[in-house]
Amino acid sequence: LYMDVTRRSPYVLLDAFKLRTIRMGALLYLLLMVINSSAMFVNVFAGVGMHLDNLQNASLGNWCMVGYAIGAVIAMVLGGKGLHFKYLFAMGFFFLSLSAVFMYFEVQTAGVYERLKYAVIIRATGMMILYALTAAYANQRMPFKYLSTWICIMLTVRMVVGPSIGGAIYTNVLQERQQHY
């Protein structure tokens, strides 16, 4: 902050927060990462409820790559066709919600490992759509001089702030729920 106040840093410009797209992009990333923290429930369910070992749990994570590929293709094709951002964002959050509903109604009742991969693929598809769109949305009307600042904001919110808040919320919820059983 000292370097930014004295204007010795060309990388972090606090004027970037005056742009609505950057503020909305940071808020969307924060919301996305808080929602994405619910993925730890998949690992808890797989480890505790289904008694999977670490290798099976890690191989379940490999199915994320399929979801990321599907999400990237959907985002590029529909974005290239000029579909409005609000519909693409709604589609991404729909996939995240669909994954949670699938986990609740399909996987939880049956407890079959093979069905768990579909929930992982659906969630990864929604996450990839939202990752791509949030970055593209903030870059839409942003002057080039704020690009490095936007990248710094995006990485800070995505890697530090969002997962910390989401992890704290879901850990407290999980701990509170365990006290009743």
Model regions and ranges:
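Membrane-helix boundary/linker segments in multi-pass transporters
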Residues: L1-N57
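C-terminal module of multi-pass small-molecule transporters
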Residues: G61-Y181
